[in-house]
Amino acid sequence: MKKLKINYLFIGILALLLAVALWPSIPWFGKADNRIAAIQARGELRVSTIHTPLTYNEINGKPFGLDYELAKQFADYLGVKLKVTVRQNISQLFDDLDNGNADLLAAGLVYNSERVKNYQPGPTYYSVSQQLVYKVGQYRPRTLCNLTAEQLTVAPGHVVVNDLQTLKETKFPELSWKVDDKKGSAELMEDVIEGKLDYTIADSVAISLFQRVHPELAVALDITDEQPVTWFSPLDGDNTLSAALLDFFNEMNEDGTLARIEEKYLGHGDDFDYVDTRTFLRAVDAVLPQLKPLFEKYAEEIDWRLLAAIAYQESHWDAQATSPTGVRGMMMLTKNTAQSLGITDRTDAEQSISGGVRYLQDMMSKVPESVPENERIWFALAAYNMGYAHMLDARALTAKTKGNPDSWADVKQRLPLLSQKPYYSKLTYGYARGHEAYAYVENIRKYQISLVGYLQEKEKQATEAAMQLAQDYPAVSPTELGKEKFPFLSFLSQSSSNYLTHSPSLLFSRKGSEEKQN
């Protein structure tokens, strides 16, 4: 048999020609208009969003938020950096897609028939309803029939405009509204509570989070049923970005990452309590300033605001608090626990906070390493409340009922079962008030959300006041001091004592740049 002589040069040339011929059909690479190829060639995923407590926010200069976290993971999935552009309202977001300034919109946007005519939706990941809001103490409308443009204002590009138009044509011909081209939904809700506006419309999740900081905002009525939330990208013949998004969300769903992120941002519950929230925020103003140094001093592995939320749940920041079961002090420690921690006076606020932190750290150290880092605190808090042994039972019960014992979202749903005989009778450590542990952790999360948002709001107000002061009394050179056109500064320069100096860092704050590199 004649041996074949292989012409490697010919094979190489043939393979090169074949690759060139097939290159345009390769889904993620190739032609210039392939979106994934363009993103990877650029080395960054451009995402436009809006600034809300849920979608995108910052604490101490560090970005966070449901949509931000998902977008960051998607950028990592593609092997590129994330570039976030923050816009003022929804209309500006879609302008970014239209003008080619964004690859994706990740901003809690609702899927609807009008939007999908012009833009490509991605997978849906939670749902909301649109609700009419008003200020507590003002007139609550029970229907839209008589609302006028002087009363009702909505944000530009808001999905509810289509619903309002349909309602006007089919049910309420007298209905009218105004669109404010300069404000987003959060700013309009602020206008409502400040008495500048009677009503606006926002989605149910945004309202729930807003109420944690502004409990005087109330829901008048639902405008729509539940609507799915999704991301949007340009609509054209290129489906590579859509395919990558689908693969990404499927992978996140299968490995439980999506459920964990949603639990982190949406798992605080929607059972808003006006009186409780208002009472808490009043305590933030009246009591927290005296306790803040202690929380900051002893908070080590956790944020001091979370520690403050724990202490409020325990005692409402009352160092003398005592329960019928004998627990006492700011962190409501038992006598035995206090003795084991070397605490001599449970009613001493500093001793109690220090001891409570050490006890919580002990619980944290016992949580299995398999539990994700950002969920360990919730397991530890449940153990802090009902005992670590019962937390082990809750994890075991979760595994037996086909849940994930390392997922707080799964375990917390089983906590109430620990007080039901058909379940606790089969567990190692028996009966526990699991429903109380569930409520305990959920309340702490709500207080933390309220505290973080409220302090941010206070900081924003202080910054705005300082900026206004800077505008009213602009900086001048020392040689100008004393001249009549600056009488206020002249007064300051002539004061021999107790004079006021304004550091530029106090007068001016860095404005949030629209584009943030992450």
Curated annotation (Swiss-Prot):
Q: Which gene encodes it?
A: mltF
Q: Where is this region: LT domain?
A: 270-518
Q: Catalysed reaction per UniProt?
A: Exolytic cleavage of the (1->4)-beta-glycosidic linkage between N-acetylmuramic acid (MurNAc) and N-acetylglucosamine (GlcNAc) residues in peptidoglycan, from either the reducing or the non-reducing ends of the peptidoglycan chains, with concomitant formation of a 1,6-anhydrobond in the MurNAc residue
NCBIfam families the UniProt entry points to: PRK10859.1
Q: Which residues form a coiled coil?
A: none
Extract the signal peptide range: 1-21
Query: Which GO BP terms apply?
Result: cell wall macromolecule catabolic process; cell wall organization; peptidoglycan catabolic process
Name listed for the protein in its UniProt record: Membrane-bound lytic murein transglycosylase F
Q: Which PANTHER family match?
A: MEMBRANE-BOUND LYTIC MUREIN TRANSGLYCOSYLASE F (PTHR35936:SF32)
Where does the record place the region Non-LT domain? 22-269
Domain comment in the entry: The N-terminal domain does not have lytic activity and probably modulates enzymatic activity. The C-terminal domain is the catalytic active domain.
The subcellular location is:
Cell outer membrane
The similarity annotation says: In the N-terminal section; belongs to the bacterial solute-binding protein 3 family.
